[in-house]
Amino acid sequence: MARYKESACRLCRREGLKLFLKGDRCYGEKCAFERRGYAPGEHGQLRRKQPSDYGVQLREKQKLKRMYGLLEKQFRGYFEKADKKKGITGTNLLLYLERRLDNMVYRLGFANSRNEARQLVRHNHFLVNGRKVNIPSFLVNIGDFIEVTEEGRKNNKIIEAMETIVRRGIPQWLELEQENFKGKVKMLPTREELTMPIQEQLVVELYSK
């Protein structure tokens, strides 16, 4: 599947906030956004123009897409599912994104970023309820167990990521047995538990035009 080829740090600077696309580096002094928080490009340090309502909605969609590393077709597919589902469309959208296997691998601390988690999933390093799953978009459910394979437990990226768990923390809706390389989805998060700086209602308004 096609992916963004632009520098992850440039994406953060363009959106004006940290998207945590480069894992542990985003928490340290080497983070490019900390050193150059203005937009990329020749005129990046100039004052930004006041965006239109459409521009604000578009930027919010771009932030959310890039945070989860999705392209437009797949992202819109999640929105359409969320819109058909009972409940608040924006919250439904966030929950679909959170239920992705690559996101859960990242949330459990088995990878330093969602992009890294996606690669590790594709390389057959994870089991869901005892069965190998190599599809990053696989949707997990409450009660599912996510476990690193025996081979995966020797992978340096997974080992290094798990060493930073204390700094990042594990969400309350997940349970981690660190010594067993195993996690469980205890529940799905409430909107209040998702602390991302996203106004998902703006995304709903954009797609509802």
Curated annotation (Swiss-Prot):
HAMAP family linked: Ribosomal_uS4_B
SUPFAM superfamilies in the record: Alpha-L RNA-binding motif (SSF55174)
Annotated function: One of the primary rRNA binding proteins, it binds directly to 16S rRNA where it nucleates assembly of the body of the 30S subunit.
Similarity remark: Belongs to the universal ribosomal protein uS4 family.
Pfam family, one: Ribosomal_S4
InterPro entries the UniProt entry points to: Ribosomal_uS4, Ribosomal_uS4_bac-type, Ribosomal_uS4_CS, Ribosomal_uS4_N, S4_RNA-bd, S4_RNA-bd_sf
Keywords: Ribonucleoprotein, Ribosomal protein, RNA-binding, rRNA-binding
Entry keyword annotation includes tRNA-binding: no
Superkingdom of this protein's organism: Bacteria
Molecular function GO labels: rRNA binding; structural constituent of ribosome
Quaternary organization: Part of the 30S ribosomal subunit. Contacts protein S5. The interaction surface between S4 and S5 is involved in control of translational fidelity.
Protein name: Small ribosomal subunit protein uS4
GO BP term, example: translation
GO (cellular component) term, any one: small ribosomal subunit
Domain S4 RNA-binding, chain residue ranges per copy: 99-162
